[in-house]
Amino acid sequence: MVRIAIAGAAGRMGRNLVKATHQNPLSELGAGSERPESSLVGVDIGELCGIGKQGIVLVDNLEQAVEQFDVIIDFTAPASTLANLALCEQHGKKLVIGTTGFTDAQRQTIEQAAKKIPIVMAPNYSVGVNLVFKLLEKAAKVMGDYCDIEIIEAHHRHKVDAPSGTAIGMGEAIAHAMGNQLSDVAVYAREGITGERSRNEIGFATIRAGDIIGEHTAMFADIGERVEITHKATDRMTFANGAVKAAIWLAEQPAGFYTMTDVLGLNDL
């Protein structure tokens, strides 16, 4: 039984992670945290998340419950995730990262830590999205040289980063399959008289509206035909169940930097 701590357990995603951990027969809830200023610190996590009293209260720092868990699942914010990364390094814990919006320097810090502890980091934990990443690699190898490639993503009004980590992941899958770095070919905004698009660029468009959980489309457009690969999420439990699956898998792994491709065994597809 893998004991899991949920960072940001009172948030939208955090509550789903608590439920997913509780429902999975191979995991159990060990701890949960919230920001120190939250009025929910000290509240029973189970009662808060609708799974019944668990005898585990929200703490303002997972250091206080470090003996109660094996793996942290963190879908919070970069600064908070890096603090939990340091805690995991210090105490030999494992870390599943669903946070997005890291700088290149912050990502390097995470990759460096993975030399000491096991870490899974992914922009999206749904099985469907990670299958889409593989499909995009194959589509890019076949169509990338002669098609215009655009990525459109939509999320709820509360999402703070753009484009989404999943959209970036889609762009990276396409760019790498074509032998490019995404930073060299990405175009994140167009306005005014932009001139004709170049053939090798990957364009991004972002929508923030209402309560959209997550929709992503990659478009390969030629003259006379267009291929679109789309994923639509309708329930956050999809991501939560995938993250718990990753935590259970990670519990048996040595130190290293892993992705959901590793967790799902998609490398050979």
UniProtKB/Swiss-Prot annotation:
Its main location: cytoplasm. GO terms for molecular function: 4-hydroxy-tetrahydrodipicolinate reductase; NAD binding; NADP binding; oxidoreductase activity, acting on CH or CH2 groups, NAD or NADP as acceptor. Keywords: Amino-acid biosynthesis, Cytoplasm, Diaminopimelate biosynthesis, Lysine biosynthesis, NAD, NADP, Oxidoreductase. One of its GO terms (cellular component) is cytosol. It is found in: Cytoplasm. (S)-2,3,4,5-tetrahydrodipicolinate binds at H156, G165, T166. CDD domains: DHDPR_N. It is an enzyme of class 1 (oxidoreductase). The active site is at H155 (proton donor/acceptor), K159 (proton donor). NADP(+) binds at R35. Pfam families: DapB_C, DapB_N. Pathway: Amino-acid biosynthesis; L-lysine biosynthesis via DAP pathway; (S)-tetrahydrodipicolinate from L-aspartate: step 4/4. Its EC number is 1.17.1.8. NAD(+) binds at G8, A9, A10, G11, R12, M13, E34, G98, T99, T100, A122, P123, N124, Y125. It catalyses: (S)-2,3,4,5-tetrahydrodipicolinate + NAD(+) + H2O = (2S,4S)-4-hydroxy-2,3,4,5-tetrahydrodipicolinate + NADH + H(+); (S)-2,3,4,5-tetrahydrodipicolinate + NADP(+) + H2O = (2S,4S)-4-hydroxy-2,3,4,5-tetrahydrodipicolinate + NADPH + H(+). One of its GO terms (biological process) is lysine biosynthetic process via diaminopimelate. InterPro entries: DapB_C (IPR022663), DapB_N (IPR000846), DapB_N_CS (IPR022664), DHDPR_bac (IPR023940), NAD(P)-bd_dom_sf (IPR036291). Belongs to the DapB family. Catalyzes the conversion of 4-hydroxy-tetrahydrodipicolinate (HTPA) to tetrahydrodipicolinate. PANTHER family: 4-HYDROXY-TETRAHYDRODIPICOLINATE REDUCTASE 1, CHLOROPLASTIC-RELATED, DIHYDRODIPICOLINATE REDUCTASE. This is 4-hydroxy-tetrahydrodipicolinate reductase. The lineage of its organism: Bacteria, Pseudomonadati, Pseudomonadota, Gammaproteobacteria, Vibrionales. The gene is dapB.
